[in-house]
């Protein structure tokens, strides 16, 4: 059985872009990879497949939600670097429960036996909400990764995620494999100065520092991974993903049980860090 990774972070922080590029980097290192998008927007795997694929919920609707009539091939698409992609999907905006759909998708994948078919399964999970179905990937994950930027709101959300992972680790095998620092800007944004202090405080570290670079924005608009953008800046943009992929595939990847901070404590600490 391979490793299962769950990627979390504040809404809009860049989880899907980071997940798609990390999945590709893992594949480039020789791993068989399945990425599962767990967001009603169903755009997690867009850079890998180049289009918005049919979601699990759409396939289930077509067969009246009879799981037994769905085949694995009905919900998976092969994308760049032979990365397989699945989108859970969800109800229309303003109705239903996206977390329920994620939970049902996780169950369906278990029925398919996919956890034994890949070297790496990566869940890209909606926002920083880890209740109900959105926490389901943590029940199967070996490792969680948090995507964050060097600002208060992002780090506050990361601390809440550390709380969830800390609690889950008492009942399951999941550990935190570190923080991906996103949109790192050493000129105007302080690099990762605050993020590094936070990581040290909660018993983890920043394991990748993805630069603030226009190539990343343009790759997302183009529906491509950075590995397909053969332009100036590609090397510096893909380097963090390749290094993190190598670390995750190593015999003993870095991983810890986080020691989250209280809400008031993090307010007080970060006021002094800024």
From Swiss-Prot:
InterPro entries: NifH/chlL_CS, NifH/frxC, P-loop_NTPase, Protochlorophyllide_ATP-bd. Pathway: Porphyrin-containing compound metabolism; bacteriochlorophyll biosynthesis (light-independent). It is an enzyme of class 1 (oxidoreductase). ATP binds at residues 12-17, 41. GO terms for biological process: light-independent bacteriochlorophyll biosynthetic process; photosynthesis, dark reaction. Belongs to the NifH/BchL/ChlL family. The lineage of its organism: Bacteria, Pseudomonadati, Chlorobiota, Chlorobiia, Chlorobiales. Component of the dark-operative protochlorophyllide reductase (DPOR) that uses Mg-ATP and reduced ferredoxin to reduce ring D of protochlorophyllide (Pchlide) to form chlorophyllide a (Chlide). This reaction is light-independent. The L component serves as a unique electron donor to the NB-component of the complex, and binds Mg-ATP. Mg(2+) binds at residue 16. It comes from Chloroherpeton thalassium (strain ATCC 35110 / GB-78). Homodimer. Protochlorophyllide reductase is composed of three subunits; BchL, BchN and BchB. It holds the Pfam family Fer4_NifH. Its EC number is 1.3.7.7. The keyword Disulfide bond does not apply. HAMAP family: ChlL_BchL. [4Fe-4S] cluster binds at residues 97, 131. It catalyses: chlorophyllide a + oxidized 2[4Fe-4S]-[ferredoxin] + 2 ADP + 2 phosphate = protochlorophyllide a + reduced 2[4Fe-4S]-[ferredoxin] + 2 ATP + 2 H2O. It comes from the Bacteria. Its cofactor is [4Fe-4S] cluster. Keywords: 4Fe-4S, ATP-binding, Bacteriochlorophyll biosynthesis, Chlorophyll biosynthesis, Iron, Iron-sulfur, Magnesium, Metal-binding, Nucleotide-binding, Oxidoreductase, Photosynthesis. SUPFAM superfamilies: P-loop containing nucleoside triphosphate hydrolases. NCBIfam families: DPOR_bchL (TIGR01281). This is Light-independent protochlorophyllide reductase iron-sulfur ATP-binding protein. Binds 1 [4Fe-4S] cluster per dimer.
